């Protein structure tokens, strides 16, 4: 039990070390120039929102990195699913009430679908992940460019209802908690997580991989 607690404390310290050091460094640079990193509530809202964006992207990327693979298509998946969700929502509700919720749900669904397509291409084609992900990236970016015609899509769909979701740190914090809870549940308490750990650690025994 003591070793487990010690390992937990070590992981927590290791996780917080880099963000804390970066925050101290950035604050020092800001203070040197007579500024502060977060000067008002709007700044704090934006800070938490972008923490959520970077954290979720990092979690998705690390799933492949841990198993020795690298997926270049994450950015194109996120961009395409977001644009599809925003444009469809705006075409149906015209920026009215519940636009943010509908856009969130559609974006998640499109993200899952695009991820499934990418995974199936890797499984069916039997090509190295770097080649598959680069191909998927080019395809998704081509579709994205065709839909938007190279224009900044937010100028078309931006309105108070659809942007209110990111206007407060509370929503971003909720998303962070939900994503962490879902990831812990999937990778620690499901058969998928069990199989993932077996592949990740390449132990002689699946039982050993799960316990490690």
Model-derived features: positions:
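Transmembrane helix-bundle core of multi-pass membrane transporters
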Residues: 4, 125, 129-190
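Interfacial loop-to-helix junctions that mark the boundaries of transmembrane helices
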Residues: 6-11, 39-47, 162-172
């Amino acid at each position: 039990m003591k070793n487990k607690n010690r390992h937990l404390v070590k992981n927590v310290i290791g996780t917080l070390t880099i963000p804390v050091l970066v925050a101290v460094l950035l604050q020092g640079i800001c203070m040197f120039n007579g500024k502060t990193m977060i000067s008002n509530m709007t700044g704090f809202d934006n800070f938490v929102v972008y923490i959520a964006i970077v954290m979720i992207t990092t979690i998705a990327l690390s799933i492949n990195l841990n198993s020795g693979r690298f997926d270049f298509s994450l950015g194109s998946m996120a961009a395409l699913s977001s644009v599809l969700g925003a444009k469809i929502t705006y075409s149906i509700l015209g920026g009215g009430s519940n636009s943010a919720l509908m856009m969130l749900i559609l974006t998640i669904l499109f993200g899952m679908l695009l991820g499934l397509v990418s995974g199936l291409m890797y499984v069916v084609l039997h090509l190295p992940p770097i080649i598959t992900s680069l191909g998927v990236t080019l395809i998704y970016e081509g579709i994205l460019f065709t839909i938007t015609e190279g224009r900044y899509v937010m100028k078309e769909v931006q309105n108070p209802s659809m942007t209110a979701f990111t206007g407060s740190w509370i929503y971003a914090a909720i998303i962070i908690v939900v994503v962490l809870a879902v990831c812990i549940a999937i990778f620690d308490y499901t058969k998928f997580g069990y199989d993932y750990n077996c592949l990740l650690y390449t132990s002689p025994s699946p039982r050993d991989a799960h316990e490690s």
